[in-house]
Amino acid sequence: MSSSAIPVLEDLYPVTMDMWPIEAREFNRVHPFYENLKAGKLTTTRCRACGAASYPPRVICPECYSEDLEYIELPDQGKVVVFSETLKGVPLGFSAPLIHATIDLGKDSPVRRLLTRVMNCPAGQLKEGDDLRLVVFEVPSHPIEKGKKGTILSERVFFAFEPVTRYSRHLQENLIYPHS
């Protein structure tokens, strides 16, 4: 089989191995989650029938099977409960260290704990109890076929959390944001 049979995105990885969700409204019933992320908000769904909130966002309530769900905002900061760092054998499309953490979003959050990726943190620096904040980042887009209507190119984002440093905490508290 020739190499041209496998679609490649900018020679980074085969599209057939794309680990990011297709976020377009036409292909995803939880597309409001991604629209909210584009606005810098981490959200999930809560059932209007029974009040259950669950993460990740759902299209059917896992408690009562209702489809009457609403999007609610989750905190954009949390504390590290436990974490793991992968330094070798990191999956294609990621770089070391690949850090995942269970974070506590606080007692008032509708979803108490969340498993997330941690970015912008050198290996060996993260500690249990560290404060983290939401970071939204762009992920590669690729053409999505829509049958006879052609293709679309969907802007895509995803989220992770990053350590809150004294410097970034100072910027947030004083509403001073660096300009690029």
Name these PLM-found stretches:
Residues 78-81, 118:
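Conserved hydrophobic positions within beta-strands
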Residues 40-43, 57, 74-76:
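Short metal-coordination and nucleic-acid-contact micro-motifs, chiefly zinc-binding Cys/His arrays
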Residues 46-49, 60-66:
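Short, cysteine/histidine-rich loop/knuckle motifs that typically chelate Zn2+
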Residues 83-89, 108, 123, 139:
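Short, conserved beta-turn/loop elements at beta-strand boundaries and strand-helix junctions
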Residues 55, 68-70:
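Short functional micro-motifs and their immediate structural scaffolds
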Residues 92-113:
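OB-fold (S1/OB) nucleic-acid-binding surfaces
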Residues 1-42, 145-154, 158-167:
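A broadly conserved sequence feature marking short terminus-proximal activation segments
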Residues 113-180:
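Well-ordered alpha/beta subsegment
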